[in-house]
């Protein structure tokens, strides 16, 4: 189940342009600036993405500051309490800022190469109007300039564990109001996301292209990046003790919480993304018979301004008799056949056959590690 909110239609990095577009459409029926407009949804899409692997930068920062502390200690210089953590965070932010600029440079080069191709390279896309805005005399750049050029990220949760020893999924509530309180992890998470948002807004204004913050689904990268990370840094508790990195800014799939709590946490970060994000909750098969509960969740996500929301339900199919339900084991409860069960799961937004054959080992393990977000205290 998906839901996209019209309220999220404008680009939060260009609110002024959005307002001018509304005024322009009212006055003369045309957009003030369609490149910066989130009003136009059809006939454009994501042109080229680059993903920054955040935990690698965090480890680089941690190792650098640990080395500096060791040298200072050898010289008899004491650091103030908390100085190591503060210095590590600051150096990480420097590395991240540099990497965001490198991503921008690579994306500009890719965009120039992509738009140098003739329309004949994808005739259907341009001459049939699939990509809007195409002007024959101007080439395919006339159409692709309306799409997004995005800087993505992977492993925010693991990055926070490296930097401060906790992620943003910690739930702390006010004892009187029961409201979710700001945690150390969420505070740093917002600082990191703000840097992405600020830089992409600057790049938009400078290059007149739709640079945006992208919460990468990492179908393959979650696994390949973790393999390289482990090879260099080994197994670190709460960081590399799984076979995958957590997608973008998601709460780790193994953390127990209610669906409402997951929405509460992730809704604080979705607004930093102007080029794609998703929040999902995992329910058991009984939710199929409780539409009232499903509707309550959808309404809650809308109230929290989640732009793209999914509810994941297990859907197992016996290939022998066609029985469909949540089948926990390898034996079909209807016909008794063993080992002929296909398991359909949503993985990074896709429903693509049996997840055990359609995705790599890391995504398979991530899917199996997912906890059900029950509506009771975790």
Q: What is the predicted function of each stretch?
A:
Residues 161-162, 363-366:
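Metallocofactor- and cofactor-centric catalytic cores in central/energy metabolism, strongly enriched
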């Amino acid at each position: 189940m998906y839901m996209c909110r019209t309220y999220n239609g404008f680009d939060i990095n260009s609110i002024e342009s959005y307002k001018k577009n509304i005024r322009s459409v009212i006055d003369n029926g045309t957009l003030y600036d369609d490149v910066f407009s989130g009003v136009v949804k059809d006939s454009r899409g994501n042109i080229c993405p680059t993903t920054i692997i955040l935990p690698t930068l965090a480890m680089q920062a941690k190792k650098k500051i640990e080395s500096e502390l060791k040298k200072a200690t050898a010289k008899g210089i004491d650091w103030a309490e908390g100085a190591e953590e503060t210095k590590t965070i600051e150096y990480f932010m420097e590395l991240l800022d540099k990497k965001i600029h490198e991503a921008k440079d690579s994306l500009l080069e890719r965009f120039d190469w992509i738009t140098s191709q003739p329309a004949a390279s994808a005739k259907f896309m341009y001459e049939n109007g699939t990509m809007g805005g195409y002007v024959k005399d101007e080439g395919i750049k006339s159409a692709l300039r309306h799409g997004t050029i995005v800087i993505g990220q992977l492993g925010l949760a693991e990055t926070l564990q490296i930097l401060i020893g906790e992620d943003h999924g910690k739930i702390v509530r006010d004892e009187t109001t029961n409201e979710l309180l700001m945690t150390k992890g969420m505070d740093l998470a917002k600082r990191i996301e703000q840097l992405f948002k600020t830089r992409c807004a600057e790049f938009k204004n400078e290059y007149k292209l739709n640079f945006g913050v992208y919460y990468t689904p990492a179908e393959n990268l979650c696994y390949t990046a973790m393999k390289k990370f482990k090879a260099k840094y080994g197994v670190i508790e709460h960081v590399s003790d799984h076979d995958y990195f957590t997608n973008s800014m998601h709460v780790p799939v193994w953390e127990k919480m209610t669906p409402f709590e997951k929405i509460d946490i992730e809704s604080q970060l979705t607004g930093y993304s102007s080029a794609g994000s998703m929040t999902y909750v995992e329910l058991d098969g009984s939710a199929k018979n409780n539409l009232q509960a499903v509707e309550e969740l959808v309404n809650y996500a809308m109230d929290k301004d989640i732009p793209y929301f999914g509810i994941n339900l297990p859907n197992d199919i016996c290939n022998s008799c066609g029985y469909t339900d949540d089948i926990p084991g390898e034996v079909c409860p209807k016909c008794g056949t063993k080992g002929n069960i296909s398991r359909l799961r949503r993985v990074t937004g896709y429903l693509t056959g049996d997840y055990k054959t359609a995705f790599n080992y890391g995504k398979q393990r991530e899917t199996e590690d997912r906890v059900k977000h029950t509506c009771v205290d975790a």
